[in-house]
């Protein structure tokens, strides 16, 4: 029996990324739970879970040799998980770095945008790429709303890492 992988490069690299996230999750959660308590544990679990979901959905979408409705479902999941990863990446920043009312407000805003984005992808997977890109980028840069508090709370290197990540993803 011959197995056909639709897009081997993407399938393999995304599978490797998913497995790396899976293997990194346990030690990170143990460290977060022991050193920092439940809120850090939860934030890290959501972040790592979002990474596993994104790379798992993407590896599956690029692997399966399907057509028609089945392929369309996997494509929707692949695209929807981008919103989950962006929101999942915000979760530790909101819960750990910002905390309090500001952190929870930003968290609700980001996950709200993610929910709308996932709904758009579920209902309109053929939307123009520019439309999706605008939502992804806007969601990624919503942190400028809390630029001041982030700058006060984070060390300069941590802030520069956060800023660099935003620039690279944009």
Regions found by a protein language model. Name each.
Residues 1-170:
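Multi-pass alpha-helical transmembrane bundles in non-GPCR membrane proteins
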């Amino acid at each position: 029996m011959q197995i056909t992988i639709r897009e081997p490069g993407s399938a393999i690299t995304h599978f490797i990324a998913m497995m790396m996230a899976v293997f990194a999750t346990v030690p990170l959660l143990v460290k977060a739970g022991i050193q920092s308590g439940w809120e850090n544990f939860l934030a890290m679990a959501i972040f790592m879970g979002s990474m596993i979901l994104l790379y798992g959905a993407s590896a599956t979408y690029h692997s399966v040799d399907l057509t028609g409705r089945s392929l369309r479902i996997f494509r929707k999941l692949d695209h929807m998980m981008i919103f989950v990863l962006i929101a999942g990446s915000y979760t530790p920043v909101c819960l750990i770095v910002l905390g309090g009312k500001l952190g929870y407000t930003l968290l609700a805003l980001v996950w709200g945008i993610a929910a709308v984005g996932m709904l758009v992808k579920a209902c309109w997977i053929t939307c123009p790429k520019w439309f999706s890109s605008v939502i992804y980028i806007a969601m990624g840069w919503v942190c400028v709303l809390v630029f001041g508090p982030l700058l006060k709370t984070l060390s300069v290197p941590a802030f520069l890492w956060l800023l660099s990540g935003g620039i690279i993803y944009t």
